A protein has these predicted regions:
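Short, flexible loop/hinge motifs at secondary-structure junctions
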Residues: 1-143, 213, 260-319
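Catalytic center-proximal scaffold of phosphoryl-transfer enzymes
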Residues: 34, 121-125, 130-523
Length: 523
């Protein structure tokens, strides 16, 4: 560090360079303070939303319609889903008038009224002393009918109505129900829905060419946690856990399986994470390769002496991550699936691609202090936007020549020296991610961004804002399952209302196939 007396020895250009460096450090301090305040708020349970403004790159690079097709297409007529009831309205006319037919006027209405049914079940005593009672109609489970249960589930999960407001609404309609009973309607007996949500995840991970992932904060049992989203254009799945580590993400990728497996994929993962060679040989040469649960795996690590090692990187952690990855592969999940993320460390597993919107946002958020800085930043943003637009064009029509040209152009853009030190360091960092940013050149079917995950996860953020956290494991699992099922139905073009009706056995409801089968077998 220079003393004040040493500043006299510096030239004007050196002083200017040092001043710019200090300005950059000072500009970074508010971000550091904001992150520390956010961490303090998180520890206090007061985590606030991030303030991130979009750069506009995605919208600006959308292909423009041709001149011939520039007119906006009309919305078209809205089809009426209900059966139409005809009513003839008579007019008062003077004598001598001639009848000229009818003028049609279509309206839609909604009838919401309470219904109470007392079933009088016949009881018979057989000659051999047995009592036979007439069974309840299909769909009756408890003292609330399937239509009421469908209404409650749709309002709470799709309509984002809170439990107190739902109770008030039902009371106003004329349904005698308490808050505790509504909570039971939302949680009790929903195992089949949770199982179907898990099956959707397995089908998606087993058959998808790509998935996007994202996470957000979640409160459970008064503790901070994380909700992770996994999905693509055909399914969505949410899972709330207490951690956002890579270990947690690998656990979620098992899609409900609880085993740990040592196979070639697991060993390759351990090598990529720099686990010591002798430890890898121990695991590879041992006869035990499959472990039913966490306890069996931990006992195996203890037997080999791996868990007793206190070195960096942690061998227990890396070996466990590898065994989880081995389990994922053993169950036929993530076969050749590309995982697209925002560069969060926990998502960097398997074939990994990065979001271009998040990459450009780093350049967009840079603080500039001179005209030279601002010109350099804007020039680089324009170059990145043009490159992004050409990547979109390549996805629509991939060719080997364009692939090679884009690779060379990437190097020219991100190896550029602008004279803005902070920007140059950022460009070098982005260039180091070349392989993950250009996965699309080999796999043009994958998206260039994670906007799908960010859009999907907003429903969870909304639920968190209006309802807070969950108090029971069943409540947490039901919330995640139904939010995922509702999003999956929307992506498959299925009405969530009809889906609930089919699953609850409501009469005269169209059958809805298992969602996992639809995800696994696209039409």
């Amino acid at each position: 560090m220079l003393l004040a007396a040493d500043l006299d020895c510096l030239s004007a250009s050196d002083l200017k360079a040092r001043a710019l460096t200090l300005l950059g450090e000072v500009a970074a301090l508010p971000q550091v303070v904001a992150e520390q305040r956010a961490e303090i708020a998180r520890l206090k349970g007061l985590k606030g939303p991030p303030s991130i403004k979009p750069s506009g790159m995605e919208q600006a690079t959308k292909p423009r319609p041709s001149a011939s097709g520039s007119r906006r297409r009309g919305r078209g007529a809205k089809r009426v889903g209900a059966a139409i009831e005809d009513r003839v309205l008579a007019a008062e006319v003077p004598a001598g008038s001639r009848f000229k037919g009818y003028e049609t006027y279509l309206i839609q209405d909604l009838i919401v009224r309470p219904v109470a049914i007392r079933f009088r079940r016949e009881r018979w005593l057989t000659p051999d002393g047995r009592t036979i009672v007439a069974p309840l109609p299909a769909g009756i489970d408890g003292h609330f009918g399937p239509e009421l249960r469908r209404f409650v589930l749709a309002q709470y999960h799709q309509g984002q109505v809170t439990v107190p407001r739902l109770v008030a609404l039902l009371d106003a309609i004329g349904i005698a129900v308490s808050k505790r009973q509504v909570v039971r309607l939302l949680i009790d007996g929903q195992g089949r829905f949770r199982a179907e949500a898990q099956d959707v995840l397995r089908a998606g991970l087993a058959n998808a060419a790509w998935v996007t992932v994202d996470d957000t904060g979640a409160r459970h049992k008064a503790q901070n946690g994380t909700c992770t989203h996994i999905g693509n254009d055909r399914f969505a799945w949410f899972g709330t856990t207490g951690s956002k580590s890579r270990l947690n993400f690998l656990d979620l990728l098992r899609a409900g399986h609880s085993d740990y497996v040592i196979n070639p994929e697991a060993l390759a993962y351990m090598r990529s994470r720099s686990l010591a060679g002798p430890l890898i040989r121990q695991l590879a040469e041992h006869e035990a390769k499959h472990f039913a649960d966490r306890a069996a795996w931990q006992a195996h690590l203890d037997q080999l002496g791996i868990s007793a090692l206190k070195v960096t990187p942690d061998p227990t952690l890396i070996a466990t991550e590898g065994a989880l990855w081995g389990s994922v592969k053993a169950h036929g999940l993530i076969k050749d699936t590309v995982i697209v993320s925002d560069d969060a460390g926990q998502f960097q597993v398997g074939r990994h691609a990065l979001c271009w919107v998040h990459a450009e946002r780093l350049v967009h958020k840079l603080d500039t202090f001179t005209d030279h800085h601002r010109v350099a930043q804007q020039r680089m943003r324009r170059l990145i936007w043009w490159f992004y637009a050409d990547l979109k064009a390549y996805r629509r029509d991939p060719t080997p020549a364009r692939r090679a040209a884009l690779r060379a152009r990437f190097d020219r853009i991100f190896k550029r020296q602008t004279g803005f030190a902070t920007l140059d360091r950022l460009l070098a960092r982005l260039h180091a991610n070349k392989a993950e940013l250009l996965v699309v050149l080999d796999r043009p079917e994958i998206p260039l961004h994670t906007n799908g995950s960010e859009n999907d996860i907003r429903c969870h953020v909304t639920k968190r804002k209006i309802s807070g956290g969950t108090r029971s494991d069943a409540g947490r699992d039901c919330r995640d399952a139904f939010l995922g099922l509702a999003k999956t139905c929307a992506k498959l073009g299925i009405s969530f209302w009809d889906y609930l009706g089919a699953r609850l056995g409501i009469p005269q409801t169209s059958a809805v196939p298992n969602l996992a089968e639809l995800v696994a077998n696209p039409a």
